[in-house]
């Protein structure tokens, strides 16, 4: 019986394998991607921007025309506006081989990881993004307006991990924040690995494209 148990364990070790790879984000943002010059008076640009932005999926939180400050926000799918790298998980066991490839900013992903010393784990990974944007309307000249979009990003990651051996789920939620053109990393895992997220400039470009 003892020899049979050892043989079974040896077979499992030989047949079970897993590896998780992480590629850091590659997005690069041009320094001027959050600024737009409009050849119209400031009041005219402001007056046309309010209804135009209201038609989009952004929420207008605050309007202060005398100071030229408008605050709008976005909440939803992070993959549209930030880059959190790429994740690949390879699993091999008695059920066969599986490979999961997905963007780190993907809103939801279910996958598996295999830890040689702990066994197979099922993961449900969810990402959410909140972007708060300050739009500043500045008069450069009588018929020229400079509009600057400064964003504060808050990315939230919620992970539920379930060990196949005991089927007991554990959930953790972590948030990071960074500004336009910046980046931040989630806390490192037990292996010292941490996922990084960077802004791509797409949110600022999309907002500024609506201002004419």
Placement of each model-derived feature along the sequence:
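Positively charged n-region of N-terminal signal peptides that target proteins for export
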Residues: 1-4
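Ser/Thr-rich, low-complexity intrinsically disordered terminal regions
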Residues: 17-212
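Residue-level signal for mature regions of secreted extracellular proteins and peptides
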Residues: 9-10, 77
């Amino acid at each position: 019986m003892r020899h049979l148990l050892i043989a079974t364990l040896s077979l499992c070790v030989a047949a079970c394998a897993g590896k998780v790879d992480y590629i850091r984000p590659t997005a690069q943002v041009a320094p001027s991607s959050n600024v737009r010059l409009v050849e119209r008076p400031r009041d005219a640009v402001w007056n046309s921007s309010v209804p135009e932005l209201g038609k989009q999926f952004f929420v207008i939180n605050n309007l202060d025309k005398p100071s030229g400050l408008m605050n709008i926000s976005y909440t939803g799918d992070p993959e549209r506006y930030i880059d959190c790298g790429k994740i690949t998980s390879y699993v091999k066991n008695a059920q066969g081989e599986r490979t999961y490839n997905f963007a780190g900013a993907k809103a939801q992903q279910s996958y598996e990881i295999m830890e040689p010393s702990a066994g197979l784990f099922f993961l449900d990974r969810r990402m959410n993004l909140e972007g708060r944007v300050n739009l500043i309307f500045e008069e450069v000249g009588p018929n020229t307006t400079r509009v600057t979009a400064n964003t504060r990003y808050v990315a939230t990651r919620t992970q539920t991990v379930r060990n196949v051996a005991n089927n007991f789920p554990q959930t953790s939620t972590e948030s990071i924040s960074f500004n336009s053109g910046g980046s931040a990393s989630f806390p490192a895992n037990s292996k010292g690995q941490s996922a990084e997220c960077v802004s791509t400039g797409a949110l600022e470009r999309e907002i500024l494209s609506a201002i004419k």
